[in-house]
């Protein structure tokens, strides 16, 4: 690793720590040439294969932006959205794949969004899964009701 101050081609790791979210490693380094210290952050790369075949880096912010639209007017905070995006990223990284299709990201958003807010879930699912009629909404609502019936302390729809 090049020193950002003197461009020396080597550095020594002084300290390594896992980040709070557990998805990256923060390393404190020292340059043997100039003696200055600097920090680096290392994360495993994760790429998204879009529907048109273009590959781009995974972005948690894109998840938040997409889900925020479904949550407009709902009692969902920015913190809730950040936690949802983190859960989605953790689920994706747990697969061990370095590339994931955009469709799979959408599928992994649905379960935590359903737990967060069922109305937002229906909005997101209606666009993502291409609901064409009231029958599609009724089927999704019926699935939510079945899930509520299976959960003893769930609120009624």
From Swiss-Prot:
Co-factor: note: Binds 1 zinc ion.
Domain ATP-cone per the UniProt entry, residue ranges: 46-136
Cofactor names: Zn(2+)
NCBIfam families reported in the protein's UniProt record: transcriptional regulator NrdR
Entry similarity comment: Belongs to the NrdR family.
One Gene Ontology molecular-function label: ATP binding
Zinc finger (unnamed): 3-34
UniProtKB keywords: ATP-binding, DNA-binding, Metal-binding, Nucleotide-binding, Repressor, Transcription, Transcription regulation, Zinc, Zinc-finger
Function: Negatively regulates transcription of bacterial ribonucleotide reductase nrd genes and operons by binding to NrdR-boxes.
Pfam families, per database record: ATP-cone, Zn_ribbon_NrdR
Gene Ontology BP annotations: negative regulation of DNA-templated transcription
Protein name per UniProt: Transcriptional repressor NrdR
Domain of life: Bacteria
Organism of this sequence: Clavibacter sepedonicus
Transcription regulation as UniProt keyword: yes
HAMAP family: NrdR (MF_00440)
